[in-house]
A protein has these predicted regions:
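Protein maturation boundaries and topogenic segments
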Residues: 1-91, 169-200
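Short, surface-exposed secondary-structure edge patches
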Residues: 51-55, 67-72, 95, 111, ...
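Short, surface-exposed secondary-structure boundary micro-motifs
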Residues: 67, 84, 109, 151-152
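RNA pseudouridine synthases
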Residues: 94-105
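Short strand-turn-strand beta-turns centered on an Asx-Gly dipeptide
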Residues: 114-117
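Soluble extracytoplasmic domains of inner/organellar membrane proteins
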Residues: 134-174, 179-182
Length: 200
């Protein structure tokens, strides 16, 4: 009788251990699957500089929808670009202003951007578009390309500059969709956790 009780306790103990092992095994596989999905669909980058101020600040951590699933940029999208001919391919963050086939012109005297001869309403910009960086306007966006500008038009290096110019879609790393961790403007402002959320 005593030996039967001992055997039952051993079996029950082993069942409990087996359950824990199976649970940890399943949890590990689930975490690996989630990591794989994350790596396929998303990327995380850090904003460097003030060209998107005040929409995005220096040091902001952004979640990107990767270019594997982000195929068709649209006006207003905030995208991350790696252009090998500019700053050794370091990622830069800009806003899509026009897509292939659209005509872009800029009235630098009044700071107004036109797409297909229609003035853009740009509530997101920090300053008017008065800085002429050398690109000739008007221009038509080439096939499989986009035209981008930074929201902080007074300091941004973007498609106005011939060094950057129009962006080939293959140079897009992804679309910024979520602000994960807020940075500061010039390192002198406290983090504003209220900025965490969907990027517009």
């Amino acid at each position: 009788m005593a030996s039967d009780r001992f055997i039952r306790k051993s079996v029950e103990g082993n069942d409990w251990k087996n359950s824990v092992v199976m649970y940890l095994h399943d949890l590990l596989y689930m975490l690996m699957a989630m990591l794989l999905v994350f790596l396929l669909f998303f990327r995380v980058i850090v904003v460097s500089g003030d060209s998107m101020y005040s929409t995005l600040l220096d040091g902001d951590y952004l979640l990107l929808l990767g270019n594997l699933f982000y195929q068709e940029p649209e006006h207003g999208d905030i995208v991350v670009i790696s252009k090998k001919t500019f700053d050794n391919g370091k990622p830069i963050v800009k806003r899509v202003i026009a897509t292939e086939g659209q005509k872009v012109s800029i009235d630098f005297e009044n700071g107004i951007v036109y797409v297909d001869d229609v003035p853009l309403e740009e509530p997101y910009i920090n300053s008017l578009t008065k800085l002429d960086e050398g690109t000739k306007f008007p221009l038509t966006v080439e096939e499989n390309c986009i035209f981008v500008l930074g929201d902080n038009r007074g300091v941004s290096l973007d498609s106005r500059n011939p060094m950057i110019g129009q962006i080939d879609k293959r140079e897009i790393l992804g679309k910024a969709i979520f602000l994960l961790i807020p940075g500061t403007s010039h390192g002198d402002l406290p983090q504003d956790m209220g900025r965490i959320g969907v990027i517009k």
